[in-house]
Amino acid sequence: KHPLSLRTFMNKSDQSYTVTPGTAATLRVDLTDAAAARGDVACASHIGLRHETNQDAAALGIDGSGHHIVLVVADGVSSTEGAEECARVASHTARDYLAATMDQGLPINDDDTVTLFERTFQKAHEAVVSGSGPIGACTLAAAVATHDRIVVGNIGDTRTYWFPDDGDPIRLSIDDSMAQAQMDLGLSREEAERGIGAHAITKWIGASATDVAPRVMAYQPQQSGWLLVCSDGLWNHVPDAGDFALLMADLVSKAHTDDHGHASPAGVADGLIAYANNCGGHDNITVALWRRDS
């Protein structure tokens, strides 16, 4: 991953970590007690097969009412010193602020919703740059989900998807990247991703960041499905949303089920990690999942 104008170009990329309900939190993946007690969420992170450290981080939380699920994933930029800590601090800060704010519920007004996410990302940025150690950089994606509403904010190229049980998948985030900038100018995805510096990100949290206002998108799910937040260590292996939906359906069909016949989010999360590693594991891989049942 290469943030533009941060040094020249920066590549992002220790052990393997998986955290699901019932297991202990680690430095790279953190669930609050309330989130860990639920059976409809899961979170997993893996170093991959090519890197020496895991610079991804994820944090899951639930508000006091139990109605708002918060999923956050951050991806550190490896050529910044402190990237690992940056991702951890940013993800925890965003999760904690959103979970605390959700005690009043998601704002109904669009402008207020955007303001909420802008404050969240600003607080994450400030927490990173005010640290005592080296200041790193990272991407950041945060999602708040209720039964009838999903709101997503992102900076960089960590992505959020909605995979309904029936119907077309929806990508709920837009990358801040050179490839996306080229697509905005009319290039096809294939052409843009072949370009020099295609994976350079144009916005980030932390070191030298000048604009930390996220893109914000809202969606109203109408049926059962899966909300996924993931680092590019996963989606780079399946960039097409339609292909990604087929992968999800296959993993769901193979996952362990509970007493009600519902696929285990933990099993699906582990399947996504395994898929990326089977494709070469070129980067750290992190996923956060929520299952919505009608």
Question: Each PLM stretch: what is its role?
Answer:
Residues P3-S294:
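PP2C/PPM-type serine/threonine phosphatase catalytic domain
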